[in-house]
Regions:
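Hydrophobic small-molecule pocket/channel-lining residues, especially in calycin-type beta-barrels
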Residues: 19-171
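Bacterial Sec-dependent N-terminal signal peptides
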Residues: 1-22
Length: 171
């Protein structure tokens, strides 16, 4: 009987220790400005798509669900990203997956001053060429976020814009 009571006490102590949300510290909350439902627009005003951003896994992961506004070659492009702050490396990370079979792993990222900047160091394009991808999210105000995707073919010395989107919160 004593062993049973001791086991229950140990279980309850462990439960109370884990009941504190491990991802509630400020560094985990740096990207919360992106949570919500959005329409994304290119600089020319054309709608690029819709994105739903939610918080999952006990507030440890930010999930993006993207759907393009228009079909290309009969396919409506869609994808998901999983964004998280890695407590061990003190870096933001993103894994992007889409319905064309592509993935991108952004294993380095930092958050500060209303920005999250990711880097994917090992990206290969359709021609088999390696390059670096940089992805920057900037909070413009409470209802607007800029997402800028860039690539570098020279190890990060110069950058070329791949896309530039302004996310506008759906009302």
């Amino acid at each position: 009987m004593k062993q049973f009571i001791l086991l229950q006490v140990v279980f309850l102590i462990g439960l109370s220790a884990t009941s504190q949300k491990p991802c509630s510290r400020p560094e985990f909350r740096q990207f919360d400005f992106w949570i919500g439902e959005w329409e994304a627009f290119a600089p020319n005003g054309n709608k690029g798509g819709d994105s739903k951003i939610s918080i999952i896994l006990d507030s440890c992961v930010i999930l993006e669900e993207w759907t393009s506004a228009n079909a290309q070659q009969g396919l409506i492009y869609s994808g998901k990203s999983f964004n998280m702050y890695n407590a061990a490396t003190h870096q933001w990370q993103q894994t992007w997956v889409d319905n064309t079979g592509n993935t991108t792993e952004f294993l380095r990222g930092e958050g500060k001053d209303g920005k999250i900047i990711y880097y994917a160091d090992k990206v290969v394009d359709a021609k088999g060429k390696n390059f670096i991808r940089r992805l920057t999210f900037t909070k413009l105000d409470n209802d607007k976020v800029r997402q800028l995707g860039e690539r570098s073919d020279d190890g990060g010395k110069t950058w070329t814009t791949e896309y530039d989107l302004e996310y506008r919160r759906k009302k």
